[in-house]
From Swiss-Prot:
Residues 417-429 have a biased composition (Basic residues). The lineage of its organism: Eukaryota, Metazoa, Chordata, Craniata, Vertebrata. It comes from Bos taurus. Coiled coil: none annotated. This is PC-esterase domain-containing protein 1B. InterPro entries: SGNH_hydro_sf. It comes from the Eukaryota. The gene is PCED1B. Belongs to the PC-esterase family. Residues 401-437 are annotated as: Disordered. Gene3D superfamilies: SGNH hydrolase (3.40.50.1110).
Length: 437
């Protein structure tokens, strides 16, 4: 998976209205996305723990939070919004998957000036820990009501991604979880898996996308889960954002940049031994470059990259070396974790005149280029003309997204994984057997 830069995320979500609904984990998803739209840096621990603050990275607190009384009750409200010249991201804090308050939120989105282009939603932990022991009937009934209502009010062009709840730890000490539930953390872990199964099945039943975050993070609770057993650290949330953006790009028919993945915030998991093959070590976390880069994938049929990489320069005769530098494509080194006071935007903001309806809009990141000079002491014959290279990718016109491409669904426990059939290990017979008469 290629990790997108801030300039590429701005391009993918250009002129898009993104709505995120859910609990405190979803609030961290909102914060990391807002930060990634501006800087190539990670969240700090204090930003992850902050709740209901008046401002965060140039966003605003619209309603609730520190404007009123702060508490951990089921009636807590918090509405945040980040608005720039080309992006609008809004967050609604939910304590139940479907309620009268959620109905008011949906009516507000439906009657507002701007209609959402992307909705990211999850609600699980509050539903299974704060509404009594017999919560399953109401939770499943509310799921059915929710997706039925979303099917009615969302437009056909709006993409809804239901992400499953993240895994919880063996010991839960988060404040919103009641003390009597904290002593039964093992049962909460099982309930989260069961709730993810019901919610995923109901979302797919109504034709919505499902991103199984529980599947992706199931093996990383020991290192990236915080001590309260519920919330995750900054590396986990950046990896989550990249998974989410890759899913959105695929759903919108946008081809990701064809560059080698230079880092992974979280490894994919332990490798599997195969007969006759050596077990290779996985890349390290947070910016360690793999020893052997992966080959570039071939472009999918029917898709065109939003910002194609510059073409390779033509081959010249060996006896005519070039005296001028020739730009070549090179992979950018991974971004280290740095304090936000020292971070800077990775690119200039996109201008409105860069976008045209004749092209395809995508989140493909601009390629990073470096230069080297080929020096020669002799020159035979006239100097061949220098090729004209296209301008940098971030200065090219940006296409518009066309929907309708087939979507790729990553493997998860709730749907079959269509992989290539395994080769047979049976050997052919040494002697020809007589054919039956």
């Amino acid at each position: 998976m290629v990790h997108l830069l801030a300039s590429e995320v701005r391009q993918l979500l250009h002129n898009k209205f993104v709505v995120i609904l859910g609990d405190s984990v979803q609030r961290a998803v909102y914060k990391d996305l807002v930060l990634l739209l501006q800087k190539d840096c990670l969240l700090t621990l204090s930003q992850l723990k902050a709740k209901g603050e008046h401002t965060f990275e140039q966003d605003e607190l619209v309603h609730g939070g520190q404007q009123g009384h702060m508490h951990n009750g089921t009636h807590y409200r918090e509405v945040r919004q980040f608005c720039s010249g080309q992006h609008l991201v809004r967050f609604y804090f939910l304590t139940r998957v479907y309620s009268d308050y959620l109905e008011d939120v949906l009516e507000e989105l439906q009657s507002g000036e701007h209609h959402p282009d992307l909705v990211i939603m999850n609600s699980c932990l509050w539903d299974i820990t704060r509404y009594g022991k017999d919560f399953w009937p109401s939770y499943r009934r509310n799921l059915e009501r929710l997706f039925g209502r979303l099917r009615q009010m969302l437009s056909e062009s709006c993409l809804l991604v239901w992400n499953t709840a993240m895994p919880v730890g063996d010991k839960i000490t988060s404040r919103f979880v009641p003390p009597e539930v904290q002593f039964t953390s093992s049962s909460v872990k099982i309930s989260v898996i069961e709730a993810n199964f019901y919610s995923s099945a109901e979302a797919q039943k109504h034709g919505f996308d499902v991103l199984d975050l529980h599947f992706h993070f199931r093996r990383h609770t020991g290192k990236y889960l915080q001590t309260d057993g519920v919330h995750w650290n900054q590396c986990a949330h950046r990896h989550l954002s990249q998974l989410l953006l890759a899913h959105v790009a695929d759903a919108w028919g946008v081809e990701l940049p064809r560059r080698d993945p230079v880092d992974k915030w979280i490894p994919d998991g332990p490798g599997r031994r195969r007969p006759g093959r050596r077990l290779e070590r996985q890349p390290l976390v947070c910016g360690d470059q793999p020893a052997c880069p992966l080959p570039r994938p071939l472009p999918l049929p029917g898709r065109q990259p939003l910002l194609p990489t510059p073409p390779c320069p033509p081959l010249f005769p060996l006896l005519s070396p070039q005296r001028h530098p020739i730009p070549l494509h090179q992979v950018m080194p991974p971004f280290p974790f740095c304090p936000q006071e020292t971070c800077f935007s990775s690119d200039h903001p996109f201008q409105s005149d860069q976008f045209s309806l004749n092209y395809l809009h995508s989140d493909v990141p601009p390629s990073i280029q470096t230069e080297f000079a080929v020096q020669g002491d002799f020159q035979y014959g006239p100097q061949p003309p220098m090729p004209r290279f296209p301008p940098p990718c971030y200065q090219q016109r940006v296409p518009e997204v066309h929907r309708g491409f087939p979507r790729y669904h990553p493997p998860d426990p709730y749907m079959p994984w269509r992989r290539r059939p395994k080769t047979s290990k049976r050997r052919a017979s040494a002697y020809k057997e007589p054919r039956p008469q």
